[in-house]
């Protein structure tokens, strides 16, 4: 009796192993067919494995006439197949015009998968449907986790609404997203919205290295775009945020003292409200923060009119200012051809006041009193113009300090 029982167990084990071996062969063959990736081979793989969601998904791509049915079978086999739920939603929305079913499928995808694609799919759906509340809800969800550049999301946001509070509420306190948004705003000339975004950015970054978060590139270029476009007030607010957060060493300019880093002690930031030395053939501009001083050299083969050094200054139109400087000419003839020029910039092209120019840098009193012309922003430039009747300048000037004060 015991022997018969053992033989029965042995037979069952052998039979089970044989069934498992056959099933394994079926699995291997089905995978081989699937990997051939043809309409016939994938259909054969599904025939062998009718409940394999991956195979059903792929077959749906080959058999457009039966796509919807195959995708339904796929989500029945694997309810967590978010991609199939999304594809069902697209068929319902785009092909059948059934937005109710489409929304159900998209939401199911977001329910079973909490990553980027389902959230972004719902954001796009509600944008197409022009449903602002749902759109901004899923916009926030999308931006909270997106690993990608977010410009497409920002573009849809601005098309859906221009309300600043609504837009700001949709942006999460993720430094990466906040920096991308500030750059998007600058690129699309939404300059008035940048200061609030930068406030949030510096708060979110905290004590991390500001060089990693756009101080020297994206934010710097955004400042330059704002000022070049005549948006002095928002640029001042951004500068203040960066200064208060310790991202900048330069002082905060104001109407009384509109020029910064006039003693040249801080190494040039080269953006915003700090000095920008310009590279020109035949000239050289060198800063010596330890001196401190700036040395301007002309080699005799420079252009007849060039800008050597410039800074945006926060002057107020109609107010009187006095610019003073300390400069020493080294082997440069007098007149030197060097002079300060104030360039007004306006948002409305052609409406700026006239440019105004000081006397020669090395001639007479080292000061210039002027009334600021009309403008929305102002660029102070130290320019060289070859004096009439003279050869091109050759020599250098050491500039030790520059100051500007409202009178």
Locate predicted features:
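Extracellular and organelle-lumenal recognition/adhesion modules and their flexible linkers in secreted
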Residues: 7-31, 148, 152, 173, ...
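N-terminal leader/linker segments that initiate helical-solenoid repeat arrays
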Residues: 7-71, 75, 82
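TPR alpha-solenoid repeat register
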Residues: 55, 84, 118-119, 152-153, ...
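Conserved structural position within tetratricopeptide repeats
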Residues: 46-47, 72-76, 107-111, 144, ...
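Canonical tetratricopeptide repeat
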Residues: 58, 87, 121-122, 156
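Short coil turns that delineate tetratricopeptide repeat
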Residues: 47-51, 79, 113-114, 144-148, ...
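Structural signature of tandem alpha-helical TPR/SEL1-like repeats
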Residues: 32-43, 63-73, 94-108, 129-137, ...
């Amino acid at each position: 009796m015991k022997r018969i029982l053992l033989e029965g167990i042995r037979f069952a084990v052998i039979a089970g192993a044989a069934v498992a071996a056959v099933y394994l062969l079926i699995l291997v063959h089905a995978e081989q067919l699937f990997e051939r990736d043809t309409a016939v081979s994938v259909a054969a793989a599904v025939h062998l494995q009718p409940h394999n969601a991956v195979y059903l998904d792929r077959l749906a791509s080959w058999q457009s006439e039966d796509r919807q049915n195959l995708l339904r079978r796929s989500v029945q086999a694997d309810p967590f197949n978010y991609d199939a739920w999304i594809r069902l939603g697209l068929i319902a929305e785009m092909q059948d015009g059934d937005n109710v079913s489409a929304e159900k499928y998209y939401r199911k995808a977001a329910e079973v998968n909490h990553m980027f694609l389902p959230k972004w799919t719902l954001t796009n759906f509600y944008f197409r449907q022009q449903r602002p509340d749902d759109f901004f809800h899923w916009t926030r969800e999308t931006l909270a986790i997106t690993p990608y550049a977010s410009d497409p999301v920002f573009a849809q946001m601005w098309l859906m609404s221009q309300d600043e509070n609504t837009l700001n509420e949709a942006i999460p306190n993720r430094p990466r997203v906040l920096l991308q948004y500030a750059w998007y705003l600058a690129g699309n000339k939404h300059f008035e919205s940048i200061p609030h975004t930068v406030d949030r950015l510096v708060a979110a970054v905290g004590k991390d290295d500001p060089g990693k978060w756009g101080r020297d590139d994206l934010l710097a270029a955004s400042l330059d775009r704002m000022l070049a476009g005549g948006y002095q007030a928002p640029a001042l607010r951004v500068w203040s945020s960066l200064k208060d957060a310790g991202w900048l060493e330069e002082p905060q300019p104001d109407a009384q003292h509109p020029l910064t880093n006039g003693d040249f002690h801080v190494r040039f930031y080269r953006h915003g409200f700090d000095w920008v030395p310009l590279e020109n053939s035949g000239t050289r501009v060198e800063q010596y923060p330890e001196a401190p001083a700036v040395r301007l050299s002309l080699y005799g083969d420079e252009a007849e009119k060039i800008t050597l050094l410039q800074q945006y200054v926060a002057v107020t139109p109609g107010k009187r200012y006095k610019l003073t400087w300390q400069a020493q000419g080294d082997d440069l003839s007098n007149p030197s051809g060097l002079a300060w020029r104030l360039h007004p910039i306006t948002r409305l092209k052609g409406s700026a006041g006239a440019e105004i120019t000081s006397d020669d840098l090395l001639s007479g009193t080292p000061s210039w009193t002027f009334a600021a012309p009309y403008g929305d922003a102002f660029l102070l430039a130290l320019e060289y113009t070859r004096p009439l009747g003279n050869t091109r300048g050759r020599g250098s000037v050491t500039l030790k300090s520059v100051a500007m004060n409202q009178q």
